[in-house]
A protein has these predicted regions:
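Small-residue-rich segments of transmembrane alpha-helices in multi-pass membrane proteins
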Residues: 20-28, 88, 154-168, 225-233, ...
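Helix-loop-helix junctions that connect adjacent transmembrane segments
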Residues: 2-6, 119, 123-130, 152-271
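Hydrophobic transmembrane alpha-helices that form the core helical bundles
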Residues: 57-133, 137-141, 155, 274-295, ...
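Membrane-interface "cap" regions at the ends of multi-pass membrane proteins
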Residues: 1-34, 38-43, 56, 60, ...
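Transmembrane helix-loop boundary segments of multi-pass membrane transporters
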Residues: 34-40, 111-125, 145-154, 269-276, ...
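TM-loop-TM module centered on a large, flexible mid-protein loop between adjacent transmembrane helices
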Residues: 76-80, 84, 116, 223-285, ...
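Membrane-interface loop-to-helix entry segments
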Residues: 124-172, 183-185, 222-226, 345, ...
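A generic transmembrane alpha-helix motif of multi-pass inner-membrane proteins
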Residues: 348, 361-434
Length: 434
C-alpha cells in the first residue's frame, strides 16, 4: 500500500501503469494464495474471482474520487471530504494500526521462506522474523528510505518470480487436485476472501495520480494495471491448487512452485527474493506510516509569531519502538503456537478493510451517478468481507476506533482552546466610546 511520488509532473501511460501495479502488488502474494487454498481448497478460486471483481469496482471508485477531490491526501483525505474530520482521524488510525500489525506479519512471511530452505520449526521462524524486523527498523532509524524507483524494482522482482513459478510448474498440473472442490464447505470461501483481501488494497494510494494523467489516459492505465494483476493473481492461484494440492505445505507456495519450475535451487531463489521483498516492503510501509503519525500527533500550541501554531510533533522513533514492541509480541505468540498465521493476518486485513469502508462510504456522499452506485456496492462488499475476519480482528478494529475517537475529541478541544486564546480584544466602550 505504498504511496506514490507527490510530484505534479504529467505521467506517461507506462510509468503511471507501473505505479498502479506497484501499489497493488506486495509480499502478501508469497503467502496468501497458499493460505486461501488451505482454508477453502480449490473453491478458493471463487474468492479470487470475486475479489478481482471487487477490485475493479475499487478502481472505478477511487479514480472518481481522485478526480472529484483532487487536493485530498490519500484515503484519510477522501474520508474527511465525505464524512468529516473525525472519520479522517479514524481512517488514519486504522491505517497506522494496519502497518503496526502488518509489518511483523510480512517479516514472518519472509522468515517462513528462509526456514523452508534451512530447516527449523516455529521457534526458528520466529527468531528469523524478529531479526528481520529489527534489522529493517534499524535501517529506518538510520534514515534509510526506499525510493519510488526501488519499490518499482521490488515489484518487478516479484512479477518475475511469480511468472517463472507459474509457467515453470505447469507440467506438474494434476487435475485430481481439484476434487473435492469445497472440502471445508461453502462458507470457507468467505474466510478465504477475508484472508486474500490484503492483496487487493492499493487503489487508494494511487488515486491522487489521476490529476497527472491527460484526458483518455486514465482508463488505459487502470485497464493495464487491472489486467496485469488479474492475470498474475489468477495464474498463481490456479498453479497453487493444480500443482501443489491439499497435501503440500502451502505456507511457502512460491518456494514449492519454483522448485517444480527450476529444480532444487528454487527454494534458495524464493528465500532470497522473499528477504529482499520483505525488507523493501516493510521499509515502504514504515515511511507512509511515519507521515501518517506526524499528521495524527500534531498538537496545537499557543506559541508562534503568527498566532496559533503546532508544538513539535511526536517523533517517528516512537512509531519504530511501537512496531518493535508489538511485532516481537506477535512473533512470540506465533513462535509459541499461541496464535496461528490466519489470526495474525486477519488483524491488519480488518484495519485496511476499515480504511476502505470509510473511503467508499465517503464516496457515496461525494460522487454522483454510476460512480455513486459503484461506491454503494463497494460498501456492502467490504462489510461482507469484514464479517469473515473473526472476532479478534473486529475487536482490534473497535479498540482502534475508540482511541481515534478519543484523540479526535481531544484535538477538537485543544483547537477550540487555542482559538479562544487569540480572539481579538474588543474596544472598551467607556474609553473608546464616541
Amino acid at each position: 500500500m505504498s504511496t506514490p511520488s507527490a510530484r505534479t509532473l504529467p505521467l506517461s501511460v507506462p510509468r503511471a501503469s507501473a505505479l498502479y501495479i506497484g501499489a497493488l502488488f506486495g509480499p502478501g502474494l508469497l503467502l496468501l494464495p497458499g493460505l486461501a487454498a488451505q482454508q477453502a481448497g480449490p473453491a478458493s478460486i471463487i474468492a479470487w474471482v470475486a475479489l478481482l471483481g471487487l477490485s475493479a469496482i475499487f478502481a472505478a471508485v477511487f479514480a472518481a474520487l481522485g478526480q472529484a477531490v483532487p487536493g485530498a491526501a490519500g484515503a484519510a483525505g477522501y474520508a474527511g471530504a465525505g464524512l468529516g474530520r473525525r472519520a479522517a482521524t479514524m481512517t488514519r488510525w486504522w491505517f497506522l494500526a494496519g502497518v503496526i500489525a502488518g509489518a511483523p506479519i510480512v517479516c514472518l512471511i519472509g522468515a517462513s521462506y528462509v526456514t523452508a530452505l534451512t530447516g527449523g520449526g516455529p521457534l526458528a521462524r520466529g527468531a528469523v522474523a524478529a531479526g528481520l524486523l529489527l534489522a529493517v527498523l534499524g535501517l529506518a532509524l538510520g534514515g534509510v528510505r526506499a525510493s519510488t524507483m526501488a519499490q518499482l524494482l521490488l515489484v518487478a522482482l516479484l512479477i518475475v518470480v511469480v511468472v517463472t513459478a507459474v509457467a515453470g510448474s505447469s507440467p506438474a498440473v494434476r487435475p485430481a487436485n481439484w476434487t473435492p472442490f469445497a472440502p471445508h464447505g461453502w462458507l470457507s470461501i468467505g474466510r478465504a476472501a477475508a484472508t486474500l483481501m490484503l492483496s487487493f488494497v492499493g487503489w487508494e494510494a494511487v488515486a491522487p495520480l489521476t490529476g497527472r494523467l491527460r484526458a483518455g489516459q486514465l482508463s488505459r492505465v487502470i485497464g493495464i494495471a487491472f489486467t496485469v494483476t488479474a492475470v498474475l493473481y489468477l495464474g498463481l492461484a490456479v498453479a497453487t491448487v493444480s500443482c501443489l494440492g491439499r497435501g503440500a505445505n502451502l505456507t511457502v507456495p512460491l518456494a514449492d512452485l519454483l522448485q517444480l519450475a527450476i529444480g532444487p535451487a528454487g527454494r534458495a531463489v524464493a528465500a532470497a527474493a522473499a528477504l529482499v521483498l520483505t525488507a523493501g516492503s516493510v521499509n515502504a510501509y514504515i515511511s507512509g506510516a511515519s507521515e501518517m503519525l506526524r499528521e495524527l500527533t500534531a498538537v496545537p500550541s499557543q506559541k508562534g509569531p503568527n498566532g496559533p501554531g503546532h508544538a513539535p510533533r511526536l517523533s517517528a522513533h516512537v512509531l519504530l519502538g511501537v512496531i518493535a514492541l508489538v511485532g516481537l509480541v506477535l512473533l512470540g505468540l506465533s513462535a509459541l503456537r499461541l496464535a496461528d498465521i490466519v489470526a495474525l493476518v486477519s488483524v491488519p486485513t480488518a484495519m485496511f478493510l476499515c480504511v476502505y469502508l470509510s473511503c467508499t462510504a465517503a464516496a457515496t456522499r461525494i460522487l454522483t451517478g454510476p460512480a455513486r452506485v459503484a461506491a454503494a456496492v463497494a460498501v456492502l462488499a467490504v462489510l461482507a468481507v469484514l464479517a469473515f475476519c473473526g472476532w479478534q480482528a473486529l475487536l482490534a478494529v473497535a479498540v482502534v476506533a475508540a482511541v481515534a475517537s478519543y484523540r479526535s475529541a481531544a484535538a477538537g478541544r485543544a483547537m477550540r482552546t487555542v482559538s479562544s486564546s487569540f480572539r481579538p480584544v474588543q474596544p472598551d466602550p467607556i474609553i473608546h466610546g464616541g
